[in-house]
From Swiss-Prot:
Protein's UniProt name: Ankyrin repeat domain-containing protein 1
Function: May act as a nuclear transcription factor that negatively regulates the expression of cardiac genes.
Annotated gene: ankrd1
Compartments in which it is found: Nucleus
One Pfam match: Ank_2
Origin species: Xenopus tropicalis (Western clawed frog)
Coiled-coil features, chain-numbered ranges: 37-77
């Protein structure tokens, strides 16, 4: 009769016996499931405990690392031993605040090519709008630079009024007449003073424009500059020896115009350059008398308003 393996090995046999006794005992009392459940709970407790410990260790290490980094950072900070150290820190702060600004690259527009013929109306409009290719096309096709509209205004007049200095130079080089007068007998210099471009004014004077040219009202370019309030134009004309005492059709000098229009900066400028304040206009008034006349007129207006309000207040009482 063959023996089983367990029976031949005494230790194994005893183990099996104990296990069978334990299982039998537990099963016998109906507590096997409870024992297994307790065993699992103990295992879970062990596992949870080990995870918590690992997490705590991790947090401790992170705190230590942060502490070391902070300590290192503090050690690397510049020390304030003197004023030079303070200035160094301020300079470093300023550098940090400076931000790089990316400037967008703008492509230059390609030159406009004009194929069709340019008529007179388009030519005048191009002078106003500073469309150089249109002007060049018109001139290249043999167009007359001195052509004018029904008011005898030329392209040069228009370009001067808008301050298109490059176009003015182009038109003059093409043969435009600087002294050409429109219906009101204004020259290019008059139109420039209306527009207020000092650069265009300088160009015209350098090209030989008459500085004291007269229009239909006998006004000079200086009269126009004072009336329109273009200080720099007036100053440049005076510096180029424009006539300070030129009289228009009403006998007014630029100073008379400045007083009448309350151009205080112009008045100071003219006085600075030695204008004669005793010149009388056609009405027999000096600039100073115009000031007094204006003041008296203002007083009369205010006095009239005061008396009117006084009467109204008394009437309202009854």
């Amino acid at each position: 009769m063959l023996l089983k393996m367990e029976e031949m090995v005494p230790e194994k046999k005893n183990e099996m016996k104990k296990t069978s006794n334990f299982v039998a005992g537990v099963s016998k009392n109906g507590e096997y499931e409870t024992a297994v459940a307790l065993e699992k709970q103990e295992d879970l407790k062990t596992t949870s405990k080990s995870l918590i410990e690992l997490e705590e260790e991790k947090q401790i290490k992170e705190k230590q690392l942060k502490s070391e980094l902070l300590k290192k950072k503090l050690e690397e900070r510049p020390k304030l031993d003197n004023l030079e150290d303070l200035q160094t820190i301020i300079n470093l702060k300023k550098r940090k605040r400076v931000k790089k600004v990316h400037v967008p690259v703008v492509k230059e527009p390609e030159p406009e090519e004009i194929i069709e013929n340019v008529d007179q109306t388009t030519f005048f409009k191009a002078a106003l709008d500073n469309k150089m290719p249109v002007i060049e096309k018109y001139l290249a096709d043999g167009g007359d630079p001195n052509t004018c509209d029904e008011y005898k205004r030329t392209a040069l007049h228009r370009a001067c009024s808008e301050g298109h200095t490059d176009m003015v130079e182009k038109l003059i080089e093409a043969g435009a007449n600087i002294e050409f007068k429109d219906m009101l007998e204004s020259t290019a210099l008059h139109w420039t003073c209306r527009g207020g471009s000092v650069e265009t004014l300088k160009l015209l004077l350098n090209k030989g424009a008459a500085i004291n040219a007269r229009d239909k009202l006998l006004s000079t370019p200086l009269h126009v500059a004072v009336r329109t309030g273009h200080y720099e134009c007036a100053e440049h004309l005076i510096a180029c020896e424009a006539d300070l005492h030129a009289r228009d059709r009403e006998g007014d000098t630029p100073m008379h115009d400045g007083v009448r229009l309350n151009r205080y900066k112009m008045m100071r400028l003219l006085i600075l350059y030695g204008v004669d304040l005793n010149i009388k206009n056609s009405a027999g008034k000096t600039p100073m008398e115009l000031v007094m006349q204006w003041q008296n007129g203002a007083k009369e207006i205010f006095n009239g308003l005061q008396s009117k309000s006084y009467k109204n207040s008394h009437i309202s009482k009854f």
